[in-house]
Curated annotation (Swiss-Prot):
GO molecular function: structural constituent of ribosome
Keyword Ribosomal protein attributed: yes
Protein name, UniProt field: Small ribosomal subunit protein eS8
Signal peptide: none
């Protein structure tokens, strides 16, 4: 867990005095970098009693073909380009907006796989 509250340090280097304890709603989590590989998902309870599916790895994507108007489940070969980070393409990290190479062509990821537990994409070639 990561605490996302205000720092105790002032810009001058001094300390702010503590007015209260840390609160549970100020906590966050480490980000999950979804990789290509055997499917691994973890169910995590979030605020309001809801759940998020953290996707650690997956080798299939639901790709929408706009010409045919159909969605096909295809195997992900690699990450071609990722605008989120320079080195994500090299490490095969899948995020929203990443361009992935699939068995039917290149596709752009349209969802947030690390928070939704599935990879959805739209065919671009």
């Amino acid at each position: 867990m990561i605490w996302q509250g205000r720092s105790r340090r002032k810009p001058s280097g001094g300390f702010y005095r503590k007015a209260r304890k840390k609160r549970k709603y100020e906590l966050g989590r480490e980000q999950v970098e979804t990789l290509i590989g055997e499917r691994k998902v973890k169910k995590i309870r979030v605020r309001g009693g809801n759940y998020k599916l953290k996707l650690f790895a997956d080798k299939y994507a639901n790709v929408y073909d706009p010409k045919q108007g159909k969605v096909v489940r295809v195997e992900i070969e690699s990450v071609v380009e990722n605008p989120a980070h320079v080195h994500y393409a090299r490490r095969n990290v899948i995020t929203k907006g990443a361009i992935i190479a699939t068995s039917i062509g290149k596709a752009r990821v349209t969802n947030r796989p690390s928070q939704e537990g599935v990879v959805n994409a739209v065919l671009i070639e």
